């Protein structure tokens, strides 16, 4: 029992469940959109999904690869096998299916597309013919007969006159040609038809009689074409007309809009003169199908060329896909040649026949002497000079078999020899080889068309291509700004060409900049065609415009591959030409060496060139020879331009090189000297391209980051190597010239790179400055100086950098390569400090560089550009990742289990989990594990409705709420984490928690190690260091301080650092005394600072002791934090010593401490204060010395306190009073401060 279409019904039910998100066991995320589906369906449709879903339930796809809308289409196709109704980019869907390894979907779509395109031209077409109208009879009364020819081999007879159609009825024509051509009714009982049927070898079903009716033009044309002479031209015209008739519906639909046709026709430069006027007349009446019928009538009358109509249709091939398909299906063998049935040789080109009979030619030609003699004795018009040179090069030093193979290769691949020229040569020597004459006669009878002619020069060929594809290219290039951007990125353009192109594009204010460039090539001839094609290749490479389809079609043109090779790799074309003449060049070089006409440098280069061109005769093919020459030239570091310079020098004394020079000039490498007919030089354009290529390659090899300082290796340059160029092409730029070989460069860095490789500089002898001994090279001189004098030849060479030791975070022990990295780590991980904020959106950042990266999101600035593909990025890290990922630059991370390579180590870690099965991210609710955190997030979002999960960094578990997360840390990781009891914030170190808790009790945990100033926030301490200790702050942070000024306390002058400050003190204030540390000799302006320094740095212990317990601390800020958190409540008041930071519970204890511990300091500071300003509190009468400290109520000390000294002008200054005053007393008027100048 078989259930019909049960599989389709099952898939439909699965698709219904998928849309309802029932029984779905996997999730596909694209950006923020999630698709639920069934693993089995995805795995069956895609090999990629099958591999990924084997180990996971969640797949994340980048939205740049496939958009959610496109993936929805693909998903529907997987379940239903149908593409939903609507507008879709079908080729994009095929490409996406291919990239996702949905090969069945991609192949099915491609097959469907192919069948849709070919359905109109495949199989036998059967048409119903209808009776002609009376108008037709009136128009063509002079054509009374109908002529019908049956196709040969159309089938055996199976009809009789009784089966013929009645007058006026439709007739089915079963022959293929008739089916494509006949469009009018043929009446029965025609004697002519009966005669044709009797004479045909295989008669078809035709009418037997015909009344006096006129045939259609199609019938007449078809009849004439089938029964006329066997000339190839007539048969070719018939087949070209047949092509137009086959696609009549497609072409007439494309030409439906008359105004559009006339506009395109006006722009088309390929259709000119009478042909253009003829087409315009055809569109004067009714357009559309009627206009195309009028065009077909003109073609039948031979007043309009078929190729002109095809050129008109080509203008629509990119706006009308049906026209493009029809033109692409127009095969050359069906259009240009006619091969009758029963023949295997006739109809093939002469070049194809020569290739097919290569073995016969090798057997016929047994010696080369007759060929050489015929070339020497032949008349000048026998063959062209180029063809003679090609034949001579193929014959020199080779066997007859190798010569025939090379001649055929020159004819088919390089297009430097025509088939007709080769046949002429063989005809001239056929008397010497008897069998050769019979073979040539047979081939010439079979051949129908001449083969391709000699390839024109690259510029001429490029001009012809531009003329042919001008309109298509103009439709693509409509943005002048893109053109200007691409022109600026072209490196192989000469400066003059670049300026001309930019000027032409900028002159056109609209979108016709490309038309201006084409006009400069085709009409004004102020620009070379190769420059335009170089621009097009750059545009295609950068994917700036949709140029791929058109370039693919252009590359199918005959000779296009050789042209584009010459445009993109002129050096290969140059070496290929030199290789063809290698024997002649070697002879010329050897002759000049024997006559000793070379300089020492030229002789060295000549020997190298001889070695490069000495290819053994047993080399398999010309391609292998070229590869060998390229390999040797690269190995010897001899570019093609140096060989060309050598040939220009050799040619002056060896005129026999003239054919080589002409051929090199033919491809644009050489040009004649001004005013000299037979003197050659390397063209400026080729010179520029060679320089750019060499410099880019050298700079790429030498550009290792961090290995050179800013000044570079100037020691390798003998003296100052640059000077102004007198004839620089751009007066605004300098030209740096090598003193050894006079080669000029626009950039100094390129000159430095060149100097390392300059052969002339290396060949010159250099003298040792120490002992006047001469050496052949700089390298030998360096070796001599090192051995004889114990010093290197480059005294200014940069010293090797010391290895930088890593720095360690004192809170968590993590190591960093640089101190700046550790500082950023502390700010973000430990202190949660973000001092830099965005003015646009208020976002805060820990580093200024991070803020700058963020600001580019608002400004849209993308300053980092990829040198390979010109993509731009907002961050340098994004560019670095891109160059690693897309262009394989820099360190890559390889998988030890497979061949996969990744740009970042984290990517490798994620990938390795696919091999090991490790799933470190575990869902707390259901226990499901995931290899990536993203997979866990999607799982929580999809299955548990948890928007933002909280992950534990210790055990990778996830929690839905912050409370659950904190509870987990208290229970499981209490020893590892330290939560704040007040706010619940968690810290990874006890010291971090202590500093944080102070913020709740009003303490100041961040204290200055120099002056003991304490702050509640780290940012306050930073600001204090910047303003009060700028030199120390700059030294600690390895960068110049923002507030780099140190003020003199005596004269208010400011200084950038302590050294300058000390110099100033010694010079201007010599009487001022500094306090020096006995152990480290450091100077301090006040004794209090010295005392704090000794306690903190040299005591070796923790000098600050708690008064209430046995705890000791190294810094006063830590003591203050301890006292405020352990011994006092937040409302209680402490009395800190401003000099040493010690804390006291009462003012009396503080005063006692000041008298016992800091009497000298108090005395010194009292004198300094009295010399500048008197600060007094007026009292009714002096008090006894034992009552100098005024004690106030504790309620009055609840606020901040100010300590004031009271100098006694009448008594000794040592008996000055110390008064503690609260801010409340100053505000409510209880105490009044009277300040005045000291007398």
Swiss-Prot record:
Q: Does the keyword Metal-binding apply?
A: yes
Zinc finger residue extent: C2H2-type: 807-830, 836-858, 864-887, 893-915, 921-944, 950-973, 978-1000, 1006-1029, 1046-1069, 1075-1098, 1104-1127, 1135-1158
User: Per UniProt, what is one Pfam family of this protein?
Assistant: zf-met
Question: What GO molecular function annotation could you give as one example from this UniProt entry?
Answer: DNA binding
Coarse class of the protein's main subcellular location: nucleus
Q: Fetch the SMART domains from UniProt.
A: BTB, ZnF_C2H2
Cite the entry's keywords alphabetically: DNA-binding, Isopeptide bond, Metal-binding, Nucleus, Phosphoprotein, Repeat, Transcription, Transcription regulation, Ubl conjugation, Zinc, Zinc-finger
Q: Which GO terms describe its biological process?
A: bone mineralization; DNA damage response; regulation of transcription by RNA polymerase II
- Record's function text: May be involved in transcriptional regulation.
Family, similarity comment: Belongs to the krueppel C2H2-type zinc-finger protein family.
Q: Which PANTHER family match?
A: ZINC FINGER PROTEIN, ZINC FINGER PROTEIN 271-LIKE
Question: What is the official name of this protein in its record?
Answer: Zinc finger and BTB domain-containing protein 40
Which organism is the protein's source?
A: Homo sapiens
Q: What is the lineage of its organism?
A: Eukaryota, Metazoa, Chordata, Craniata, Vertebrata
